[in-house]
Amino acid sequence: MKFLFDLFPVILFFVAFKLFGIYPATAVAIGATVVQIAWVHFRHGKAEPMQWVSLAIIAVFGGATILLHNETFIKWKPTVLYWLFAVTLIGSVIGWRKNLIRAMMEKQVTLPEPMWGRLNVAWAGFFAVMGVLNLYVAYQFSTDTWVNFKLFGSMGLMLVFIVAQSIWLSRHIQETPSE
């Protein structure tokens, strides 16, 4: 359910684009992200830092798209977010010696120490490639194709990556002793 909730602004953007075009869809995405964070804040007392970052990026790039009537800005938004994720994953290890993937997953999965580093790099690489791929689709195809890719292509590639990662991890997961 959380996965669908996280996709709420993207799904509304997609529907609004199909019905009204890129500029109204961008306004809908900004509004949906604000509503999403307000709801999370209301339900849980605070929103996650990445939700705030996502709001800031959609507000800046979406706002520029609407104000300047130039769809290029909204097309850059996923790339900026993907690259920010990649830099954050690598930067947290280099700057603070903290593996964020491990911090998020270690309660669910027990892995040998070197595997956490590889997993972190794999996710950073995935996000870096997704940023490049988004720009490729944005500049080489129509806006309609880009919007379809933004929802279905990105989600499909993420699913393939997660399945491949799960298969790869299954060979390295360590059993935890039962009490």
From Swiss-Prot:
The chain crosses the membrane at residues 3-23, 49-69, 76-96, 121-141, 149-169. Keywords: Cell inner membrane, Cell membrane, Membrane, Transmembrane, Transmembrane helix. InterPro entries: YciB. It holds the Pfam family IspA. It is found in: Cell inner membrane. GO terms for cellular component: plasma membrane. Plays a role in cell envelope biogenesis, maintenance of cell envelope integrity and membrane homeostasis. This is Inner membrane-spanning protein YciB. It comes from Cupriavidus metallidurans (strain ATCC 43123 / DSM 2839 / NBRC 102507 / CH34) (Ralstonia metallidurans).
